[in-house]
Amino acid sequence: MPPSILLLNGPNLNLLGTREPRIYGSTTLSSLLTTLIQKCKSLALPLTLLDFQSNHEGALIDRIHAARGNVDFIVINPGAFTHTSVALRDALAGVEIPFVEVHISNVHKREEFRHRSFLSDRAEAVICGLGVYGYEAAIEFAGRWLKERGEVKAKAKL
Protein backbone atom coordinates (compact mmCIF):
# COMPACT_ATOMS: atom_id res chain seq x y z
CA MET A 1 0.00 0.00 0.00
CA PRO A 2 1.43 3.42 -0.91
CA PRO A 3 2.24 5.87 1.88
CA SER A 4 -0.60 8.18 2.79
CA ILE A 5 -0.83 11.86 3.59
CA LEU A 6 -3.77 13.08 5.65
CA LEU A 7 -4.91 16.61 4.86
CA LEU A 8 -6.72 18.11 7.86
CA ASN A 9 -8.57 21.41 7.68
CA GLY A 10 -10.01 23.07 10.75
CA PRO A 11 -12.81 25.54 11.41
CA ASN A 12 -14.21 27.74 8.66
CA LEU A 13 -12.07 26.18 5.94
CA ASN A 14 -15.25 24.67 4.50
CA LEU A 15 -16.01 28.29 3.52
CA LEU A 16 -12.78 28.62 1.54
CA GLY A 17 -13.42 30.57 -1.64
CA THR A 18 -16.24 32.64 -0.17
CA ARG A 19 -15.03 33.66 3.30
CA GLU A 20 -12.96 36.84 3.26
CA PRO A 21 -11.53 36.26 -0.24
CA ARG A 22 -9.19 39.25 0.12
CA ILE A 23 -7.40 37.26 2.85
CA TYR A 24 -7.97 33.63 1.85
CA GLY A 25 -8.47 33.88 -1.92
CA SER A 26 -11.24 32.55 -4.13
CA THR A 27 -10.20 28.89 -4.42
CA THR A 28 -12.76 26.54 -2.88
CA LEU A 29 -11.82 23.61 -0.68
CA SER A 30 -13.12 21.22 -3.34
CA SER A 31 -10.99 22.86 -6.03
CA LEU A 32 -7.98 22.82 -3.73
CA LEU A 33 -8.40 19.08 -3.14
CA THR A 34 -8.47 18.46 -6.89
CA THR A 35 -5.25 20.46 -7.25
CA LEU A 36 -3.57 18.54 -4.43
CA ILE A 37 -4.51 15.17 -5.91
CA GLN A 38 -2.87 16.31 -9.15
CA LYS A 39 0.15 17.50 -7.16
CA CYS A 40 0.55 14.03 -5.64
CA LYS A 41 0.44 12.49 -9.12
CA SER A 42 2.98 15.00 -10.47
CA LEU A 43 5.53 14.03 -7.83
CA ALA A 44 5.99 10.62 -9.46
CA LEU A 45 5.58 9.06 -6.03
CA PRO A 46 2.92 6.53 -5.16
CA LEU A 47 1.07 8.57 -2.51
CA THR A 48 -2.49 8.38 -1.25
CA LEU A 49 -4.11 11.67 -0.21
CA LEU A 50 -6.83 11.49 2.43
CA ASP A 51 -8.77 14.57 3.53
CA PHE A 52 -10.92 15.66 6.43
CA GLN A 53 -12.40 19.02 7.42
CA SER A 54 -14.29 19.86 10.57
CA ASN A 55 -15.37 22.91 12.49
CA HIS A 56 -15.26 20.82 15.68
CA GLU A 57 -12.10 20.32 17.70
CA GLY A 58 -13.13 16.88 18.97
CA ALA A 59 -13.79 15.60 15.44
CA LEU A 60 -10.31 16.70 14.34
CA ILE A 61 -8.78 15.01 17.38
CA ASP A 62 -10.72 11.81 16.68
CA ARG A 63 -9.45 11.83 13.07
CA ILE A 64 -5.87 12.33 14.25
CA HIS A 65 -6.24 9.40 16.65
CA ALA A 66 -7.66 7.23 13.84
CA ALA A 67 -4.61 8.11 11.72
CA ARG A 68 -2.22 6.40 14.13
CA GLY A 69 -0.71 3.41 12.36
CA ASN A 70 -2.70 4.20 9.20
CA VAL A 71 -1.22 7.48 7.94
CA ASP A 72 2.41 8.35 7.23
CA PHE A 73 2.26 12.16 7.25
CA ILE A 74 -0.22 14.91 8.14
CA VAL A 75 -0.68 18.30 6.50
CA ILE A 76 -2.84 20.42 8.79
CA ASN A 77 -4.39 23.85 8.61
CA PRO A 78 -5.82 24.06 12.12
CA GLY A 79 -7.50 27.40 11.46
CA ALA A 80 -8.31 29.28 14.65
CA PHE A 81 -7.47 26.19 16.74
CA THR A 82 -3.83 27.10 16.01
CA HIS A 83 -3.99 29.73 18.71
CA THR A 84 -6.18 27.96 21.26
CA SER A 85 -5.97 24.18 21.18
CA VAL A 86 -3.65 22.39 23.54
CA ALA A 87 -5.82 19.32 22.88
CA LEU A 88 -4.99 19.37 19.15
CA ARG A 89 -1.30 19.75 19.99
CA ASP A 90 -1.48 16.81 22.40
CA ALA A 91 -3.30 14.65 19.83
CA LEU A 92 -0.61 15.31 17.21
CA ALA A 93 2.16 14.62 19.73
CA GLY A 94 0.41 11.47 20.91
CA VAL A 95 0.15 9.77 17.52
CA GLU A 96 3.75 10.60 16.59
CA ILE A 97 2.96 11.23 12.92
CA PRO A 98 5.14 13.91 11.31
CA PHE A 99 3.18 16.97 10.19
CA VAL A 100 3.38 20.31 8.44
CA GLU A 101 1.32 23.23 9.71
CA VAL A 102 -0.15 25.33 6.88
CA HIS A 103 -1.79 28.76 6.94
CA ILE A 104 -3.11 30.47 3.83
CA SER A 105 -2.47 33.97 5.15
CA ASN A 106 0.69 35.27 6.77
CA VAL A 107 -0.48 35.03 10.37
CA HIS A 108 2.45 37.20 11.48
CA LYS A 109 1.11 40.16 9.47
CA ARG A 110 -2.29 39.90 11.16
CA GLU A 111 -3.68 40.46 14.63
CA GLU A 112 -1.35 39.83 17.56
CA PHE A 113 -3.37 36.87 18.86
CA ARG A 114 -2.69 35.02 15.59
CA HIS A 115 1.08 35.14 16.12
CA ARG A 116 1.07 32.30 18.68
CA SER A 117 0.74 28.69 17.54
CA PHE A 118 0.35 25.75 19.90
CA LEU A 119 1.51 23.41 17.10
CA SER A 120 4.52 25.03 15.42
CA ASP A 121 7.22 23.74 17.74
CA ARG A 122 6.03 20.16 17.12
CA ALA A 123 5.79 20.51 13.32
CA GLU A 124 8.40 19.37 10.80
CA ALA A 125 7.74 22.67 9.02
CA VAL A 126 5.37 25.64 9.08
CA ILE A 127 4.16 27.30 5.88
CA CYS A 128 2.24 30.56 5.98
CA GLY A 129 1.43 33.42 3.67
CA LEU A 130 1.69 31.55 0.36
CA GLY A 131 -2.05 31.40 -0.22
CA VAL A 132 -3.43 27.99 -1.16
CA TYR A 133 -0.10 27.24 -2.87
CA GLY A 134 1.18 26.60 0.65
CA TYR A 135 -0.73 23.32 0.60
CA GLU A 136 1.06 22.26 -2.60
CA ALA A 137 4.40 23.12 -1.00
CA ALA A 138 3.44 21.07 2.05
CA ILE A 139 2.46 18.05 -0.07
CA GLU A 140 5.74 18.25 -1.97
CA PHE A 141 7.66 18.52 1.30
CA ALA A 142 5.79 15.53 2.75
CA GLY A 143 6.58 13.45 -0.34
CA ARG A 144 10.25 14.33 -0.15
CA TRP A 145 10.33 13.71 3.59
CA LEU A 146 8.82 10.24 3.15
CA LYS A 147 11.13 9.44 0.23
CA GLU A 148 14.25 10.47 2.17
CA ARG A 149 13.28 8.14 4.98
CA GLY A 150 12.63 5.23 2.65
CA GLU A 151 8.87 5.29 3.24
CA VAL A 152 8.18 5.63 -0.47
CA LYS A 153 10.00 4.53 -3.60
CA ALA A 154 10.08 7.09 -6.38
CA LYS A 155 8.83 6.25 -9.85
CA ALA A 156 11.16 8.96 -11.09
CA LYS A 157 13.52 11.44 -9.46
CA LEU A 158 11.97 14.46 -7.74
Curated annotation (Swiss-Prot):
Keywords in UniProt for this one?
Answer: Lyase, Quinate metabolism
> Briefly, what is this protein's role?
Is involved in the catabolism of quinate. Allows the utilization of quinate as carbon source via the beta-ketoadipate pathway.
* PANTHER family assigned to the protein according to its UniProt record, in alphabetical order: CATABOLIC 3-DEHYDROQUINASE (PTHR21272:SF3)
Identify the residues that bind substrate. N77, H83, D90, I104, S105, R114
Outline the subunit composition.
Homododecamer. Adopts a ring-like structure, composed of an arrangement of two hexameric rings stacked on top of one another.
Classification lineage: Eukaryota, Fungi, Dikarya, Ascomycota, Pezizomycotina
What family does the entry list? Belongs to the type-II 3-dehydroquinase family.
Site annotation (Transition state stabilizer) points to: R19
One biological process GO term for this chain? quinate catabolic process
- Quote the EC number: 4.2.1.10
Asked if Transmembrane helix is a keyword of the record, the answer is: no
Copy the pathway line from the protein's UniProt record: Aromatic compound metabolism; 3,4-dihydroxybenzoate biosynthesis; 3,4-dihydroxybenzoate from 3-dehydroquinate: step 1/2
Family matches, as InterPro entries = DHquinase_II, DHquinase_II_CS, DHquinase_II_sf
Write down the chemical reaction(s) this protein catalyses.
Answer: 3-dehydroquinate = 3-dehydroshikimate + H2O
Gene Ontology MF annotations: 3-dehydroquinate dehydratase activity
Task: Name the source's superkingdom.
Answer: Eukaryota
Record-annotated active site: Y24 (proton acceptor), H103 (proton donor)
Its name, as the record gives it, is Catabolic 3-dehydroquinase
Which is one Pfam family of this protein?
A: DHquinase_II
Q: Which SUPFAM superfamilies does the entry mention?
A: Type II 3-dehydroquinate dehydratase (SSF52304)
